[in-house]
Amino acid sequence: MNKFTYENTPLGKIASGYVEEVGAVEPRNTYNQKIAGGEYRQENDHGGHLIAHSLQGSSGLENIDPQNKNVNQIDQRHIEREVASYAQDSNNSVFYSVANYTPVGERPQATMINYSVTNKLTGEQINEYASFQNESHALQEQWSEEVYEN
């Protein structure tokens, strides 16, 4: 079973740990997913896990924040699937870290993900970083268009 640490900081939540197994080990807490963010939750938000349920992340509120559905189901899920594919190879050691930037208790403004894969046989290492604004793809495209118009 994977072990992750969860931390609340003045700038948001951080979760990290080694991914050694793939596959959920506890039932989803759909209630926590529905209440994540409270009054700050927006209409198109999901209760998104910092560490994915499929990577054995906790179903507790320490691991769930309101997250735009595009970010949750497309952007972050893409990275989670990459991490899972690396972790399924027993020759790999996979460290995974996710930070949601915002004061705790509010809707995150951004998600930052880092992961590192080390092949135990060859020593080869892969380091990846991604960050996402916690807004819909349509709104982000609009921002880009406004930047290029000016």
Predicted regions span which residues?
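Domain-level detector of nuclease and nuclease-like folds
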Residues: 2-150
